[in-house]
Amino acid sequence: MDLTPREKDKLLIFTAGLVAERRLARGVKLNYPEAMAYISAALLEGARDGQTVAELMHYGTTLLSRDQVMEGIAEMIPEIQVEATFPDGTKLVTVHQPIA
């Protein structure tokens, strides 16, 4: 399998997102990379499913709460930016204060 660097990045985000999802299911609080991967993977999948940038910007704020991440993690992530592929091209999705 010959993947481009962008495809490798997406695969890494997706894999890390799955690890984070499994840890959440077990009740484990997420650390910084896990929280970033969890939200980023959900945004990439939402774009692939046809959601708009505005919908994803809102959706990104509903994925994790402070109770689901380690202490101090919410403050470490003031925003998340993901370059996602939509049906009409690639766009930057920015989610402000993703962990409420």
Curated annotation (Swiss-Prot):
HAMAP family: Urease_gamma (MF_00739). It catalyses: urea + 2 H2O + H(+) = hydrogencarbonate + 2 NH4(+). It comes from Pseudomonas savastanoi pv. phaseolicola (strain 1448A / Race 6). InterPro entries: Urease_gamma (IPR012010), Urease_gamma/gamma-beta_su (IPR002026), Urease_gamma_sf (IPR036463), Urease_subunit (IPR050069). The keyword Cytoplasm applies. The gene is ureA. Belongs to the urease gamma subunit family. Its EC number is 3.5.1.5. This is Urease subunit gamma. Pathway: Nitrogen metabolism; urea degradation; CO(2) and NH(3) from urea (urease route): step 1/1. GO terms for cellular component: cytoplasm. It is an enzyme of class 3 (hydrolase). CDD domains: Urease_gamma (cd00390).
